[in-house]
Amino acid sequence: MPDKGFPADPRTRFRFAVALATIAGIADAIGFMQYSQLFMSFMSGNTTRMGEAASSADWVGVARFGTVIAVFCFGAFAGTLIAAWSGRWRLPALLLTQATLLLTGILIPHGPEAVPWHVYPIVLALGLQNATLQDESGRSLALTYVTGSIVRFGAGLANMLLHKPSPSFWIQGPLWAGLAGGAVIGGVLQRAFGEAAFAVPATFLLTLAVMALLLTIKHPTNDLVTSAHAPQPDARPEAKPTVSV
């Protein structure tokens, strides 16, 4: 069955994926530097910090890191539902939501250390981002963390030597480079603009949302976009859709 994930064209999907990984790196670096080494998308790091806080009976730290992890998980949950319900509009809908959440994080007042609600919209946006794109098998592409990408790239190289190459393992390298480059950009922006630097990745997301919306309107039935037969996130390509558009 032909690939119907949005964007259906692999070249378009690849460009969007690298762009989104770069944006995630920008946002994570800004948040890490701005909010006392609290990760916006690297939940492995926050999990380690939460465990360290628990070991020293720092319950404020446990609450701080634990709530951020929960919000990120909810973002992935909500993003998957939005993607499934939005049909061909999934990309503009998710990107616009992410841009709005990043700007919201700048505007709301700061919460206490144990419950930093001002970072929750930003973390939620980055959780949503992981449901934005699918690979050719209908699985969501992880765009905000790279440990899995590095593992898959290494395993892909080994499988290539074993004459069992994965068709898309090579994309993991550019995704890592995008996230790493974004982190450099985010660090520079945070030093220059502080918390207001989040407006930069929000603007990038808004620009991508407009591009995706124009593509969807201009090519509503083209494989470049998708159709009602597109698989849901994390589903096999032959899976039946639950929404008709």
Identify the function of each model-found stretch.
Residues A99-A114, A212-T216:
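C-terminal ends and interior cores of transmembrane alpha-helices
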